[in-house]
Amino acid sequence: MPLTHLNEENQPKMVDIGDKETTERIALASGRISMNKEAYDAIINHCVKKGPVLQTAIIAGIMGAKKTSELIPMCHPIMLNGVDIDILEEKETCSFKLYARVKTQAKTGVEMEALMSVSIGLLTIYDMVKAIDKSMTISGVMLEHKSGGKSGDYNAKK
C-alpha cells in the first residue's frame, strides 16, 4: 500500500480530501497515568497547590483536540462538534485512566484529535503533580474505537 502523504517525488504532502464524502466521524481514545500513593491522594483530596488537577486535565484535553492540526504536520484542521472526556480513578493501582471521545461531521476522521486529547490531558496531570512524584508514567495511549468514513468502523481488541 503506497503512503498517501508522499508525492510522486517521494516528498511530503498533505492529502487532498476535497472529493471525500462528509460523514459523521467519532473517535474514542484512552491512556493511563500511574503515580505513587502520595500524588494520587493529593489529587483525590484536592491538595495540589497548582489547583484542581482532574478538571484542569479535562480542559487541557479539550484544548489538545482543538489544536491537533497545529502540531501534527499532515493533520487537517477539522471543525469539531464535540469533545467529551472522562477520567476514571483507579485506586488499587494509584492511576487515572483518561478517555476522550471526539465527534465531527467532516471529510476526514478525528482519531488524531482523540489521541492528542488523551496525551495532553495526561501530560497536564503530570505537570501539575510532578513536584510530588517525578516518576509518574504515562502508558497505553491508544485508539479504542472509530466510526465513519470509507474505512468503516474500528474497535480495538480487548
UniProtKB/Swiss-Prot annotation:
Principal EC category: lyase
One Pfam family from the record: MoaC
InterPro entries: MoaC, MoaC_bact/euk, MoaC_sf, MoCo_biosynth_MoaA/MoaC, Mopterin_CF_biosynth-C_dom
Catalytic activity line of the entry: (8S)-3',8-cyclo-7,8-dihydroguanosine 5'-triphosphate = cyclic pyranopterin phosphate + diphosphate
One GO BP: Mo-molybdopterin cofactor biosynthetic process
Enzyme Commission (EC) number: 4.6.1.17
Amino acids binding substrate: 74-76, 112-113
Pathway: Cofactor biosynthesis; molybdopterin biosynthesis
Gene3D superfamilies reported for this sequence: Molybdopterin cofactor biosynthesis C (MoaC) domain
Keywords: Lyase, Molybdenum cofactor biosynthesis
Active-site residue list: 127
GO molecular function, one term: cyclic pyranopterin monophosphate synthase activity
Family: Belongs to the MoaC family.
PANTHER family: MOLYBDOPTERIN COFACTOR SYNTHESIS PROTEIN A
Quaternary state and interactors: Homohexamer; trimer of dimers.
Chain's role: Catalyzes the conversion of (8S)-3',8-cyclo-7,8-dihydroguanosine 5'-triphosphate to cyclic pyranopterin monophosphate (cPMP).
Name of this chain's protein: Cyclic pyranopterin monophosphate synthase
Biological classification of the source: Bacteria, Pseudomonadati, Campylobacterota, Epsilonproteobacteria, Campylobacterales
Gene that encodes the chain: moaC
